[in-house]
């Protein structure tokens, strides 16, 4: 599973020509560790480590094929931007996906949005409910990675 995720991340980063990630050649190490994610899909550290929960990712991938690509790139965004601001990183991730504009990237983004919309309880760090977070992601795709600042 780790090799598959690394390959997906590598391919995604190769596709994006105007990305911060490509320009700065920022590397990340993917590490399977469910305890480090504290129940989440994945989490990143500023020093370039992305911890992920393979069981959680497999469950999401089974129900929402392609969605995990969004979450891995999202964690990579924390490293690239050196930011813990979830809305900023969501916006960056959405915009990176919009730059890719491939069949696979569009499928992944749609799957992630569908997964995110299922969350009904508000989480302020992500901008509210799953519906509100999904709307932010959609707007960031359309308007760019700084969209979150004014909304």
Predicted region positions:
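Alpha-helical segment that forms one wall of the substrate-binding/catalytic cleft
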Residues: 87-98
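C-terminal capping/extension segments of zinc metalloprotease domains
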Residues: 22-63, 82, 96-151
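Active-site recognition of the HExxH zinc-binding catalytic motif
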Residues: 70-82, 90
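Functionally constrained cores in energy, signaling, and assembly domains
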Residues: 7, 14, 69, 76, ...
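Classical Sec-dependent N-terminal signal peptides that target proteins to the secretory pathway
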Residues: 1-21
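Alpha-helical scaffolds flanking conserved acidic
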Residues: 65-70, 88, 110-113
């Amino acid at each position: 599973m780790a090799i598959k995720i690394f390959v997906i991340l590598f391919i995604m980063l190769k596709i994006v020509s105007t990305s911060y990630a490509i320009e700065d050649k920022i590397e990340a190490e993917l590490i399977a560790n469910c305890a480090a994610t504290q129940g989440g899909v994945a989490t990143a550290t500023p020093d370039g480590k992305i911890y992920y929960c393979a069981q959680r990712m497999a469950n999401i991938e089974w129900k929402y094929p392609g969605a995990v690509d969004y979450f891995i790139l999202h964690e990579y965004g924390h490293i690239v931007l050196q930011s813990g601001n979830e809305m900023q990183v969501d916006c960056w991730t959405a915009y990176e996906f919009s730059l890719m504009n491939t069949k696979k990237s569009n499928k992944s983004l749609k799957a992630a949005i569908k997964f995110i919309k299922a969350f009904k309880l508000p989480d302020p760090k992500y901008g509210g409910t799953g519906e509100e977070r999904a709307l932010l992601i959609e707007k960031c795709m359309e308007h760019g990675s700084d969209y979150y600042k004014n909304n």
